[in-house]
């Protein structure tokens, strides 16, 4: 059995693992990373963020072609099969793997392929795909193994018509009708993607509102546009059982309803990838969803073992995971690169997309904070008219007296890009966080960023 010694060993090469590895390597630590795949990137690159967003982009291009009258001179509306559209995602994945492999090579980080499990607090054992066993001994460890779709034991995911958000990327046909169970972020994103391909979608929501953590107005706008694209949303429903057929599935709901479709996509929750880590050997416990509890330093209950990314739960975003991993490594090397990642913008890649940061109206009302609202509707923005993307708005919530920006909410094209301007101003100290910044700053014209100036003037006009 080969034994290797390192300063830090990182389990996983997704965003959290990469963030930890890159930061620790800058401080001269001898590092190794372990991943179950032969290629880096984790589920984010291979099954989650990258393929789903590349898929969304392709579908959005199809929608633009089919709805823009100018293209009728070229040909009639075209519909593409799901496998054909998925090919564009494959091209992006290969480019991402090449780029990220270069990062590890340039920083002289050793890479091991296999399944890792803890032997004790200083040792992990790696079983390679060939069955060989290697031991890695280190002073510190970072667990960044990510998560996977939650699979209830009473549903047969081996049935050829039953998928989760990982296996849906292997779908070899385009269903005419699809049931999506779970109306969280992933469920809503795939509802947009499949409806954009002309698939009839039944979106089953276990709650009474889509994405209830969003501002009510944004949530309502999402519901409207999904329904406008032939998505049938069913709120307050729970499954009783899933019946697999030769040519489809029937979803039996506890309300007594039955829904038949060509396929079922299960999008109801995720589970941390911790079951094979041998955490019982080091005394680390996980919750019912397999997630590890950490403190504000991303340290687990074992002082030399840290954890970051989806494996610790909220917010389960690739953007946050990278910073969490970087911060965990910052604690290991005792640098000033540490921070607890809590103020994270939300990016939801539906069609149109959604992004927000800060408080929403319900939260401010409950806290009895005197706020006002400024809005800019995209249909009045020159850039939106030029790009034929009139749907959406930017909404700024600010304090009536101090003009401090309390929240920014955006629905529409480029929402996940636009939100960062508001985020930058909200992060300014004291009086520098003010709505006046947007009225006293010259924006390029025409741009979508100009919506901040329009929304700011709208908000100021409401004051008296």
Swiss-Prot record:
Binding note for cofactor: Binds 1 FAD per subunit.
Family membership noted in the UniProt record: Belongs to the class-I pyridine nucleotide-disulfide oxidoreductase family.
Activity regulation (record text): Strongly activated by NADPH and 2'-AMP and inhibited by NADP(+). Ca(2+) increases the activation and decreases the inhibition effect.
GO biological process: 2-oxoglutarate metabolic process; NADP metabolic process; pyruvate metabolic process
Positions annotated to bind FAD: 35-44
Locations listed in the record: Cytoplasm
Matching Pfam families: Pyr_redox_2, Pyr_redox_dim
Reaction catalysis annotation: NAD(+) + NADPH = NADH + NADP(+)
NCBIfam families from the UniProt entry: PRK05249.1 (NF003585)
E.C. code: 1.6.1.1
Record key words, sorted: Cytoplasm, FAD, Flavoprotein, NAD, NADP, Oxidoreductase
Keyword NAD assigned: yes
Function: Conversion of NADPH, generated by peripheral catabolic pathways, to NADH, which can enter the respiratory chain for energy generation.
Chain's gene name: sthA
Source organism: Pseudomonas aeruginosa (strain ATCC 15692 / DSM 22644 / CIP 104116 / JCM 14847 / LMG 12228 / 1C / PRS 101 / PAO1)
Main location as per UniProt: cytoplasm
Gene3D superfamilies: 3.30.390.30, FAD/NAD(P)-binding domain
Assembly mode: Homooligomer; probably composed of four stacked rings of 7 or 8 monomers. Forms filamentous structures.
GO MF term list: dihydrolipoyl dehydrogenase (NADH) activity; flavin adenine dinucleotide binding; NAD(P)+ transhydrogenase (Si-specific) activity
Name used for this protein in its record: Soluble pyridine nucleotide transhydrogenase
Domain of life: Bacteria
